Amino acid sequence: MSTTFNPQVDLSWSGSARSVRRLGDNWEPLRRLYFLDFPLLLLSVGLLTWVFPTDTMLVVSSSVGAFVGFYTLWEVVVRRRPIRFAHFFCIANTAGYGFGVLNSWLTISRGDRGLAEFFNRDAEAVSRAMAAVLISSGILYALGEIYESPIFGSNFKLNFDNRAVAFIFFGTVLIIVGYLTGTMGYMGTSQDSGGHVTVLAGLLAWLFPALFAFTCLTYLAWPKNALKSAIGFALIVQFILLVPTGRRGILYFIVMALIASRFSSFRPTWSFFKKIIYAFILVIVIFVGALTFYYLRVAGWGKHKVSLVDRISLAIDLFESGNTSKANEGFEKNLQKRTFILGYLSDLLDASLRMPTAMGKNALHEFQLVIPSAFWEDKEAFLYQEESVANTQFNFAYKDEANSLYTAGAIDFGLWGMVLYPILVCALFRLLAEFLRVNLPEMVSTIAILALLYNSLVTEAGLWVHLLAVRNAILFSAFLWICFKMPALALKHPPQKGAFLR
């Protein structure tokens, strides 16, 4: 395709020379697959599903969404194609909702019942919710490919030095301190008695995904020596510390590590057989980590406020007893049912078609949630969740559901909110990433942007979670800047260009 016509928005501050653009400047031309083919496919299947909302069309639309989402992810991870926030949000929603439905449909024994009926949902409402996901994603795919310039140029490679290693070790120690002080534990970071998240808890929750990806990247780029082994050990420690935070976190962290590996000079030349072996090992690692987390969950059943140390002890006792059939069966059933996260969204969208919507009240409340407590003395009075807004607006009785950008949009503006909210948050992320790119050193801006990319890849992240990621990126980038402000020490064996230069 000719590159003479390229309407992408160039988000560069005035005065920045194109030849020295931070994070690379070699961009691929527009790809028809993403500004035309995929959008048309998603829009056409979505419209058909909306007009014919049956259980069969639910499976068809979910399959199409899962295929498009995973293909986009494969292109980013394996083929190292351009990274855009728009496409990451599309991956999160098409693969998250689509594969979730497809997995439950394939694995649950339902007899003659449809999937929606099995989950006590209306088939038409569930089908139309999946249709809305495809329609919204189709629009975002096209807008992202046309108007959002890639964050990283295809020629971008990070320059590593002693400061990168110091940051890895310091960050790993910080995570350990978080566990020792109770700031982190089972299911991630904890809150104080007033429901507030401490500064350390907020820092660790924001930093951990990017730290893990950056550690993997540094390990691949570092030459073979004792320090490389130390980096590898830190990576193993981080993975062990990751397991108690949740199964989805394990998957997302590893995906982000694979994406970050593109920023080094490391290029695997493995045979096809070796690639299969390594992929199989990776799947085993994810499975073992997820199963370990589930054992930690089972160990706490029937008990009140079980500490992480007690959970680990009880989980070990459970495993050594050999009486794990109930836990394994529960793990299997959980994998079958937990992925069906479309039900809550379908209820909200269906209600929004019949009843007045919140008209932005939910968005305003979720914005209030991310205001630091230091600036709002009685903030705890407003610490209710999205479900409370939905319950008040639509007369539901939800307690804890799968929040997302789509559910926030459906509460406020119905279908139009599902289309609009991802676009607005994507634009906000891209503007912030550009600000970080221009004003911070490459190493610091890359880590901060990796944290934003991680957030955009998570399906079950409500509007306030995305706004929190923006707030934390602004606040905690100063912490990263300080970490990398220390002087760089000369390396004993100067590396080749593209591995470490500073």
Task: Give names to the regions the model predicted.
Residues I277-E380:
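Aromatic-rich transmembrane-lumenal/periplasmic boundary elements in polytopic membrane proteins
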Residues L42-F52, R110-D122, T183-A201, A397-Y406:
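Juxtamembrane membrane-water interface segments that cap and precede transmembrane helices
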Residues G15, M57-L58, R113-F119, Y141-G302:
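Membrane-embedded catalytic interface detector for glycan/lipid assembly enzymes
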Residues F52-T54, L241-R248, T459-L467:
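Membrane-interface helix caps and helix-loop-helix hairpins in membrane proteins
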Residues L40-L48, A92-S104, T172-L180, F233-V243, ...:
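Aromatic-anchored segments of alpha-helical transmembrane domains
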Residues F214, N395-R502:
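Hydrophobic alpha-helical segments
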Residues M187-S190, V197, L353-W416:
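Long extracytoplasmic/lumenal interhelical loops at the membrane interface
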Residues M1-I151, V255-L258, R262-I286, L468-I482, ...:
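N-terminal "leader" segments that precede or initiate the main folded domain
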